[in-house]
Design a protein with these regions (language model features):
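Alpha-helical transmembrane segments within multi-pass membrane transporters and channels
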Residues: 1-39, 208
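Transmembrane alpha-helical segments in multi-pass inner-membrane proteins
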Residues: 8, 155, 165-234
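Membrane-interface helix caps of multi-pass small-molecule transporters
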Residues: 12-24, 46-50, 112-113, 161-164, ...
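Terminal peptide-recognition signature
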Residues: 14, 20, 38, 123, ...
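Transmembrane helix-bundle core of multi-pass membrane transporters
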Residues: 32, 36-116, 171, 224-229, ...
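Hydrophobic core segments of alpha-helical transmembrane domains in multi-pass membrane transport
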Residues: 37-44, 100-112, 151-159, 182-190, ...
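Helix-loop-helix "hairpin" substructures at the membrane interface of multi-pass membrane proteins
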Residues: 78, 90-170
């Protein structure tokens, strides 16, 4: 039910964000940040003030003591690992969530198939150079909106799978945490701002999840406090994203400078040829 409800919401948000980004070409990165902050404020307004007075809440245990708004953490123990347990196989005492793995594999196959379709090729062309794509007859604005819709729908499904696996819902931080960790995992796996692959996803998840396990234990061994490892993990998450953005901007400026020098050299060679 949650997945079904998430689809129209994700589609509407994807269309809205895509249209906003179409009006901010060349400034997509900072615009995306501002949209994220704005939508976070809208979301918190709904869960803090609309839940109860406007949107009815049946279970009083979900409400804040004041009578409206949602508590900081909502327990999902009744549905914890409900998807994982639907088709689980125990191998050597280790439970393997087969259905969840099938869904992940299906998503990967969909992406591989989609990249070979005309729309997938159009998206790739738009991502590489919008002006060249427009000259080739591609509707750049429409393609960007569709790509954003697909992204938000996948993100909604991913959030639902994540929450049912964890078994609790941090009302005011869950959406920011999973987004930050997903970006960091992708970058750790070798992805860049311009390009990412399925290989980067799996490698990043393995490395990042390993850090989740190792960091608290390392903090306990070195300082006697596991929270030091937790702080280190958060630091690495933000540091990886920051370094990736700095490297991307430096690479972009270097390429622009090289193109300018090449253009100047070509013009000089042309003038010398005319002089002869």
């Amino acid at each position: 039910l949650a997945a079904i409800i998430s689809i129209p919401i994700s589609v509407l948000l994807g269309i809205m964000i895509g249209k906003l980004l179409n009006r901010a070409k060349g400034r997509e990165m900072i615009t995306s940040y501002m949209i994220a902050f704005a939508m976070d404020g809208v979301y918190q307004f709904f869960v803090l003030f609309m839940m109860g007075p406007v949107i009815p809440i049946i279970h009083n245990t979900l409400k804040l003591p004041r009578g409206y708004g949602i508590r900081n953490t909502v327990s999902l123990l009744n549905m914890r690992q409900s998807l994982d347990n639907l088709l689980a196989v125990s191998v050597g005492g280790v439970k393997t969530p087969v259905l969840t793995l099938i869904i992940i594999a299906a998503a990967c196959l969909f992406i591989l198939w989609f990249r070979r379709t005309k729309l997938g090729q159009d998206m790739r062309a738009v991502g590489q150079d919008m002006e060249v794509a427009r000259d080739a007859g591609i509707n750049v604005e429409r393609t960007r909106v569709i790509s954003m819709v697909i992204s938000t729908v996948f993100a909604g499904f991913g959030m639902i799978i994540y929450l049912q696996n964890v078994g609790n819902f941090p009302t005011y931080t869950a959406h920011t945490q999973i987004g930050m960790f997903s970006i960091a995992a992708l970058l750790v796996g070798g992805a860049s701002v311009e390009k990412a692959s399925i290989k980067n996803v799996f490698l990043g998840v393995i490395l990042f999840h390993t850090m989740f396990i190792v960091a608290p234990r390392t903090g306990t061994v070195i300082t006697g406090d596991s929270m030091i490892g937790e702080y280190f993990r958060v630091f690495v998450s933000y540091a990886v994203i920051t370094i990736a953005l700095v490297m991307y901007e430096a690479k972009k400026r270097k390429a622009k400078s090289a193109a300018g020098l090449q253009l100047a050299a070509d013009q000089l060679a042309e003038e010398e040829a005319k002089a002869k």
